[in-house]
Amino acid sequence: LDDDDHVDIELPFQVQYHGELYSEMTISSNGWVSLVPCNIDYFWNMSIPSFMGPKAMLAPFWDDLEVVGQDWIRVYTWHDTVGGRFIIEWSRALNGYDELTEETFEIIIYENSSMPTDSGDNVIDFQYLEIADVDVTKNYSTVGIQSPNNNDGNSIIFNNVYAAGAAPLSNGRAIRFTTMSPQSYVSPLEIETENTPDM
C-alpha cells in the first residue's frame, strides 16, 4: 500500500463480530482494518471508542506508518486453510515519527471451525514481532477494537496510556480478543492435619 492508503478485500470466510456477519474488509496502511468498508486515509490515530474512527475496527497498531526509501508499505494477507485462520500482516513498516523505526505486526482471525465460541463471534489475535511505540508528537499509537456503531470498544493503549491491567507492547507479545471466558483455575489449599502452638 502507498502512504495513507487503503484497500478493500473480500474475506476468505464470513467473520462474525459483535454478533454481525461480514464478508469484506478495508485494510489501512496505518495499522488497522475495518469490517465495514470505509475511505478513511488520514494518519492521525484517536482513542477507542471514537465516532470519527472506522466502524468495526481492529487496530493492532494504529499510527502514522510511512513509505520512506521504498515504494510501498508491505501489507500481506494469507488464508491458512489448514490452520483455519486469516492473517493480515504489516511487515517492516516505518514509523512516521522518525522514519527509521520498523514495525512488524499482524491480525489473526480464526475460523469458527478451528476455534469455536459460544457466541459465534470469531476469535481475533494481535501479534507483534517487532514493535516500538515511539510517536511522541501524534498520540503515540492506538491499540484495540471498536464496535460496528463506534459506541463501544476495548482499548489497550492510546497516547502511551495503557488500560488497567494491560501488558505493555513488546516484541513477541500477543493479545487475544474473544467472547469466551477463561478457564477458571483455583489451586488446592494445603491443609495441616495437626496444629500445635509454638511455645
Residues covered by each model-derived region:
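Extracytoplasmic Ser/Thr/Pro-rich, glycosylation-prone low-complexity segments
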Residues: 1-191
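Short, solvent-exposed loop/edge segments of extracellular or virion-exposed proteins
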Residues: 190-198
